[in-house]
Design a protein with these regions (language model features):
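N-terminus-centered regions that define maturation/targeting leaders and the start
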Residues: 1-146
Length: 149
């Protein structure tokens, strides 16, 4: 499987320089678009986590920005005019509960008891855009598939 995007640095709209309307509770919440190619034909579900291991020296743990589980592959729209097999559109995290309610978005690091942040599920169980306080960080989007939820 291969993940790709139309950028190599997360664009401002999806991170700390996003417009005010893209924030909720002081956190950028509009998720970035990406593509998934070379998916195993036996796979029925997608799962992923978007994490920041560079946060460990800053806050003491790897920051979880977004986690998704049990996303049915057949619920995603295939664009036969596109060269990519699957496209995750911008703002998918906020749209997902209404579009595919059986898919779970796990708690992100904003839910940590060490931070004392929001308890709003729209913040703690959705995408949280990068806001590194010290320097540019390297992020990882880890993608998994399964044949059962």
């Amino acid at each position: 499987m291969k993940i790709s995007a139309d950028f190599t640095v997360i664009p401002d709209d999806f991170a700390k320089a996003a417009a005010p309307e893209y924030f909720n509770g002081g956190v950028p919440v509009v998720s970035f678009p990406f593509y998934i190619d070379d998916v195993d034909p036996e796979a029925r579900y997608l799962h992923w986590e978007f994490v920041d291991p560079d946060s460990i020296p800053v806050c003491g743990f790897e920051w979880i920005h977004w986690s998704v589980a049990n996303l049915p592959i057949d619920a995603l729209m295939y664009d036969f005019n596109d060269s990519h097999a699957l496209a995750i559109p911008p703002d998918f995290s906020r749209q997902l509960p209404a579009m595919i309610p059986e898919t779970v978005q796990g708690r992100n690091s904003s839910a940590s008891k060490f931070l004392g942040r929001s308890t709003d599920p729209a913040v703690i169980m959705r995408y949280n855009g990068p806001q590194p306080p010290d320097k540019d960080h390297e992020y990882y989007c880890l993608l998994y598939t399964s044949d059962a939820a």
